[in-house]
Amino acid sequence: MSHFLFEIGFEEMPARFLPGLVDEVKKLFAEGLTQAKVDCGTIAAFATPRRLVVSVPDLAAAARREEEVVSGPPEKVGFDAAGAPTKAAEGFAKGQGLDVSAVFVMDTPKGRYLALRKTTGGEAAIELLPALCLEAVKKLSFPKRMRWGSREFAFGRPVHWFLALLDDAVVPFQFDDITSGRATYGQRIMGPGPFEVPTAAAYFDIIRDKGKVVLDAREREGIVRSQAEALAKEAGGTAVINPALLAEVTGLTEHPVVLLGRFDPKFLDVPREVLITSMESHQKSFAVEDGKGGLLPVFLTTLGLVPGNVELVRRGWQRVLTARLEDARFFWEADLSASLETWQKKLENVVFLAGLGSMRDKGKRLERLCGLIAEQAGKPEIMLEASQAGGLAKVDLVSDMVGEFAELQGIMGGIYSRRKGQSKTASRAVAEQYLPAGPDSPVPATLAGAILSIADKADTLAGCFGLDMAPTGAADPYALRRAALGICRVVIEHGLRLDLMELLQGAIDGYGEVKFKVDRTHVLAKLLDFFGQRLKAYFTGQGYDTLVVEAALGASYTDIAALSARLSALAGFAAKPDFDQAVLTFKRAANIIRKQGVGAGVPLTGAVKAALLEEQAEKDLAAVCQDVFPRFDALFDAGDYGAVLELLYELRPSVDAFFDNVMVMCDDMDMRLNRLNLLKSLVDRLGRVADFAALQV
């Protein structure tokens, strides 16, 4: 087996591009080698800011040889009456690169046809690899591409070299004016190169020892983490490591070195969140905290090389960070001198969305809607403070701090509200209003925060749908899918018993005289359908079977917390060995009622007349229903859906016997209607748990 190595060298690539490039280049070479029939072992890929590397240490020297039978024209046109090959046979053989003497006749389901046995493959790997390298370079995708010089070709950043080796041989190709070779380049300062690489296997030692490049991103990340933790410990604290920032600095350096710097303790009067954000966003630096969670006046930054003069570099970083912290301190002090009333007044000039009023209008809607949600959820004790939080929710949008650090919106609102005399509960809710910020983000920890989060998202959804701005395809500029999913998660994780229809109607009503482009009754219907789609996506993403999710949604989904509990119980029911047979029984009943919604022109009510029960099986079913239904209703109202589904095992034998021995659609219309009503009473209760007709077994 041979060792293949391919390196694309380029100018500094944005850190966010690198993980995708690693995955994509592995996939491109895996597909290309498979298509070329070149066997290989594991394909590894690595990326730094200046290079993308593919390594295939176990590559076959040549493509597999395979014999295939190629069919041609029918026998009757391939040979003449004397049995001699015709022009058609000769053309067929020539087209396959073989002599006509190799043609034979093959029996097929369609008759007798000319055929050839053809051997393919066997090409040397070094002959196939140039095309694969070129194809990979052309197909790599980037969030943004650029052109340079007079080239028509676009790439993530300008390309400077290609290293391509199969063992000790150069894989020859040229792209634009760049020719592949055996030269590589190292870290710009510590090991610039070029370095000649004699073999593919030698590349890794050369790039590390001479080029001073740590190729593996996982190793670079480990270096940053371990050095940061060690330096923080020496300073008497613990590094505050943001995973996103750790990934970013890992992608910004080829030879990471962590440096500890210090700043004036006077800046510790500024809130922790502000200091950390300033360090992370402007200086790509980590904060250090003490054992009580308070920040220490030190920071950790990641360099891309070992500095020649450590103290000079440290002073430079400290000087730059100090300037940033001075700005943050100025914003903090300026904001503390402003009043909430002044900010509320300024919000009148901040547009929420064109046609939906100002941010002050939104704050008033949230104040009202938070109170409604607290009342609907049966949480009157939190109603006042939740409403207060709604009114304060957007005040920090006009603060100097949020003007500089937009990512602190909400967080600063909570801090400022508390500093300006608002309750701890309301202030905490303001700080949590934007949670969850994504699928992996936590939901608000407090009840008031949960209510404000729901209200804020519901208000945005109602307004956008009212202006006919629902998401279409992949386009979702206002993150409405995330907003709906956020509401679902908050409701489920807090166990809030909210009626989704009432919630959304309350949000729609909050817009008062605002003119919608869509009729308000249609807005509600579209929103409910939208939530149904989001709930399906959410629960299937949680691992639930699609049919089980659809069955649970088919019963009802306006009580999201109850839906989650019903779905969990239904999934447990579906895992039982006799699930399929039970479903068939109750699905049959559901299908009959679906088709016979009106019996003999009379709407079915579920009311059964005992005097019309004639067959023993229908009498038995009526008796079992009379016994089970009160327990069913009590358990359902208590939310014990697992116990509700267990009752189906008590019902099923009588239902099976009913279908085996009773003619539902009999000639006697009164009796038919009574039997349909008996099934209706059963299906109505089953339908509160799941739409059994939607289950396919």
UniProtKB/Swiss-Prot annotation:
> What's one GO BP annotation on this UniProt entry?
arginyl-tRNA aminoacylation
Keywords of the record = Aminoacyl-tRNA synthetase, ATP-binding, Cytoplasm, Ligase, Nucleotide-binding, Protein biosynthesis
| Pfam families listed in its UniProt record | DALR_1, tRNA_synt_2f
Among its keywords, does the record have ATP-binding?
Answer: yes
Q: Which family does it belong to?
A: Belongs to the class-II aminoacyl-tRNA synthetase family.
Its assembly, as annotated, is: Tetramer of two alpha and two beta subunits.
Q: What is this protein called?
A: Glycine--tRNA ligase beta subunit
- UniProt organism field: Solidesulfovibrio magneticus (strain ATCC 700980 / DSM 13731 / RS-1)
Gene it is expressed from: glyS
